Amino acid sequence: AWRTYLLDNLLQPAAVWATLAAFASDQHLGCVFPAFYKLLKEGMTHAGTPPYSTSTEYSMILDLMSRMGLPGEYARSEQFFSGGTMFWYRPQALQPLLECGLRFEDFPEEPIGVGGTLAHALERIPPLVCTRRGYRVRSLTCFPSIQYPPERFQD
């Protein structure tokens, strides 16, 4: 359900057109992604895993931001990110991230669990990079009805 939600809200024709229109109408828009998937957030909360950064992820985020030459400190209120690391972006907005030299070898082998890894820290980075570079970030959800699959409400 989560993958369907992300793919539909990123790649369905209506979502693509809405996203392209948003970028065309706002030259300072740097990153667009669907709203955080509600069932994922509920599952994380139930498991005791915060949807904002853990202390391990926070430390990795600070290191990555420093590596890119950008201010790293941030408030939890800035934790607005794409769960699943699937989004549209303006290349100039994320240039430091694209050039920071991350390699495949920097990431642990799968399965990686639900938090505390470089992949989870990296998931939270794009909006921070965009805003530090003067770009805006927004969520755009064209198909909110697929947030909760029908079987969730059956007895």
Language-model segments: residues:
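ER/Golgi luminal nucleotide-sugar-dependent glycosyltransferases, focusing on the catalytic module
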Residues: 1-155
